[in-house]
């Protein structure tokens, strides 16, 4: 059996690890582990792909390790495929140790029997989902009085995933909750009842909030009609309809995961007003709970050349917040790719 565990200094580590959950809550960034064994199975799934490796101990007993990656859709855009790892292959794998299970890790790189080194963030080939149109021809500037957001958008390749609100790489385990100050007494009680390890909605394939949707590493497709603006986030297959023909929200709307949205144009900006949310969290880590009184306003502002747009937002919650919160997400650019079904597989946590 070959298993090595030691500390390391981390510099600029794995931005993509934050695409779906806060890395530090599940894995130890200061503990690197290396295992050697045989590939048992490669699960090319979302939100996290997994490779299962059988490691034979000194006593001859086989122990199966599970090491996870970012999601299959993101991997496919850097050349990964379902058969990148095949059962029976000899593998030496290096990753970062899980905090709660001794035989789990987060994949960093692997060395195969022929000496090939495979890195999660190193491209293995072309984008499986790339369109034939070039980025130059797909960039469309605003037309007439209505800014043209139609197309596929996402973060620039290599940017990793943001957490919204200028939060960078995401909070660390045991770190301060930078937004706790906004919570009312009721909000504080909701925070005390929230466990980010097991209650994170995305673990259960449910989108937590608009800030997370805009901050993932997966693309978003927008279509525009006269009275409907549709935002299709590849992550978790979320589709949001923004009704442009309404001046106010209808009465008696049932609460829903992503609320009810109306919108209007202000020059090169689309303003999205959303109410009737189900209770959730604005940020999963360490947690910022929201009630069904949450009211958000997003502003999507298209650049002059039509190739990028900025995202800013405000959030009010008369039940859980004492003041309004505001923030922004990383700008998105037009992408030369197509959306794919996400088909989220719920995660097991302990």
Predicted segments with their positions:
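Short, compositionally biased strand/turn segments
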Residues: 11, 19, 238-240
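PEST-like low-complexity, intrinsically disordered acidic/proline/serine-rich tracts
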Residues: 24-350
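Bacterial N-terminal signal peptides
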Residues: 4-16
């Amino acid at each position: 059996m070959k298993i090595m565990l030691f500390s390391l200094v981390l510099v600029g580590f794995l931005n993509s690890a934050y695409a779906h959950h806060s890395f530090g809550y599940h894995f130890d960034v200061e503990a690197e582990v290396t295992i050697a064994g045989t590939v048992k199975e490669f699960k090319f799934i979302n939100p996290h792909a997994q490779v299962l490796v059988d490691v034979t101990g000194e006593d001859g007993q086989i122990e199966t390790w599970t090491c996870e990656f970012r999601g299959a859709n993101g991997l496919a855009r850097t050349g990964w495929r379902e058969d990148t790892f095949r059962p029976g292959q000899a593998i030496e794998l290096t990753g970062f140790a899980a905090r709660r299970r001794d035989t789990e890790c987060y994949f960093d790189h692997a060395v195969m029997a022929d000496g090939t080194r495979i890195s999660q963030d190193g491209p293995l080939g072309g984008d499986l989902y790339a369109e034939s149109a070039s980025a130059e021809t797909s960039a469309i500037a605003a037309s007439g009085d209505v800014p043209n957001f139609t197309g596929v958008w996402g973060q620039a390749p290599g940017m990793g995933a943001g957490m919204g609100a200028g939060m960078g790489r995401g909070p660390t385990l045991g770190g301060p909750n930078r937004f706790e100050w906004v919570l009312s007494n009721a909000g504080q009680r909701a925070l005390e009842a929230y466990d980010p390890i097991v209650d994170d909605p995305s673990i259960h394939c449910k989108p937590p909030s608009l800030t997370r949707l805009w901050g993932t590493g997966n693309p978003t497709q927008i279509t525009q009609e006269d009275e409907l603006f549709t935002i299709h986030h590849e992550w978790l297959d979320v589709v949001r309809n923004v009704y442009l023909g309404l001046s106010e929200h209808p009465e008696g709307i049932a609460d829903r995961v992503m609320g009810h949205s109306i919108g209007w144009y202000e020059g090169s900006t689309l303003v999205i007003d959303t109410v009737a949310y189900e209770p959730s969290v604005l940020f999963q880590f360490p947690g910022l709970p929201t009630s069904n009184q949450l009211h958000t306003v997003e502003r999507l502002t298209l650049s002059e050349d039509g190739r990028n747009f900025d995202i800013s937002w405000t959030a009010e919650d008369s039940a859980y917040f004492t003041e309004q919160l505001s923030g922004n997400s990383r700008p998105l650019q037009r992408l030369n790719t197509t959306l794919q079904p996400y088909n989220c597989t719920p995660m097991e946590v302990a």
